[in-house]
Amino acid sequence: MRTIAIVGKPNVGKSSLFNRILMRRKSIVDDQPGVTRDRIYDVGNWLTRDFMLIDTGGIISSEDTYQDNINEQVLFAINEANTIIFLVSAKDGINNDDKKIAKMLKEKAKDKKVILVVNKVESEKYYFNEGELYSFGFGKFFKISAEHGIGMGDLLDELVKDMPIQNALDQQERFKFCIIGRPNVGKSSLTNTILGEQRMIVNAEAGSTRDSIDNDFSYHNKKYTIIDTAGVRRKGKIVEAVEKYAVLRTQKAIERSQLILLVLDGSEPFKEQDEVVGGLAYDANIPTIIVVNKWDNIVNKNSHTMEMVKKQIRSQFKYLSWAPIVFISALDNKRIHTIFETIELVREQAMRKVATSLLNDVVIKANAFQEPPPFKGGRISISYVVQVQSQIPTFVLKCNNPKFLHFSYARYIENEIRKAFGFDSVPITLYWQDKNKKLRGE
C-alpha cells in the first residue's frame, strides 16, 4: 500500500485536508497553531485505490519545547512516505518557513513524488504569486479548499493515478485495543516500545499527546491495532477547547476498542485522576488490563512489593476487580510480553462459549444451594439460563419476576458463573428477564 504524508508549516490546513480526504473527522482541527503533534495514520480510498495517509505537525523555527520533536516526527513521515503533499496557505502567503520546508524536501525527499498544494483558496485575496510557487521546483501545483472541498477531485486523481487497484485493509482480522491513563503515565512510551519506533512524541511534560492515533502492527503473527489517546485530566483542568475535544476523542477511542489497557504510574502513589480514568474503563464494560508502568523506577523493592501494589489497586479500583494486572517498564522494554500474553488470555475468555446444559446445571444448583433473600414482596427463582452473542460473556436468566432480585444475590450468581467457567479476567453481564417474555429469535 502506498503512503502519502502531508507536511507544511502550522495552520495551513493539514489536518483539515487529512479529514477531507478521509471524509471524516480524524485529526483535531483548530485555529491555534501546533495542534497536531504526532504522526496520525489512517487508510484512505479513491477510485478503488487504497493508501495510507499521514498527518504531521507543523514545521517552524520556534522555542516551543515540542518543536524539535515535531520536526523529527515530520522527518519520520517523509521517510515512510512514497508521496508527499507540501501544503501552503493562499490566505497567509509564502514565508521563510515555507521556503525552509521546500529546501528540506529537496534534500530529504529528492527520490519521492512531491505535490505542491495551495489551500484556503476560498479567500477573496491570494497573498502569493505563481512565480514564487514555481520557484520551489516542484512543477505544477493544485489549488484547493480543504474546508469547502474545492479542487479535491483533481488532487485525489493526481495522488492515486500511479497506484495499483487493491482492496482495503481487512480490519476485521485485527484485534483493536486502546491505551488510556492520566497524562504522563507513559502511554506514548508504551506505544513506541510496542511499535519499535518513536511514532508518538514522548516528553516529560504532561499532555504531549492530543490526538488518539491508530497504529496497525503484528506481534507473533497476530494482527493488532493499538490506539494511543490523550491523557484524561480532571475536569477543572480542561481549559482549552482542544483539550476538551481530546478527552472526547479518548472516549471515542474506547468505543472503537475491543480491550482497554489502563496505564498507571507505579513509581508514585495512585491519584484521583487514575480512578476517574478507571471509571471510563468500567463504564465501557469491555475487557480491561491494568498496566503498572515505570516498575523499574521503584527503589527498595522486595519479594512482597508486587503483591502490596496489587492489593492497593484492588482497594482503589474495586469496580475493576476482575481486571488482570501486569507490571512493566515501557522505556526499558521490560515485561512487555506479559501484556500480549494477558491480552490473549482475556480474548479467549471473552470469546468463550458455555454449553447451555452445563450453564443451567451450575446456575440452577447454585440457586437451590443458597436460597435467595426475600425482596420487594417475593423471592427470585431461576428457571432457565442461556448465553447470548456479545463482545463479553453475556447471560440471560429467566426468572419468576426480576423485581424480586436483590443485588447481593445477583453478585452471588455472577461469582458462581465466573468460578465454574473460568471467567475471572473479563467483565460479564447478566440480564434478568421474566420467564414469560421471549428472547429475540426464540
UniProtKB/Swiss-Prot annotation:
Keywords recorded for this protein, A-Z: GTP-binding, Nucleotide-binding, Repeat, Ribosome biogenesis
Segments forming domain EngA-type G: 2-167, 175-351
Subunit architecture: Associates with the 50S ribosomal subunit.
Sites where the protein binds GTP 1: 8-15, 55-59, 119-122
Name of the protein described by the UniProt record: GTPase Der
Record CDD domains: EngA1 (cd01894), EngA2 (cd01895)
InterPro entries in alphabetical order: G_ENGA (IPR031166), GTP-bd (IPR006073), GTPase_Der (IPR016484), KH_dom-like (IPR032859), KH_dom-like_a/b (IPR015946), P-loop_NTPase (IPR027417), Small_GTP-bd (IPR005225)
Top-level division of the source organism's lineage: Bacteria
Pfam families: KH_dom-like, MMR_HSR1
Purpose: GTPase that plays an essential role in the late steps of ribosome biogenesis.
Gene designation per UniProt: der
NCBIfam families per UniProt: GTPase_EngA (TIGR03594), small_GTP (TIGR00231)
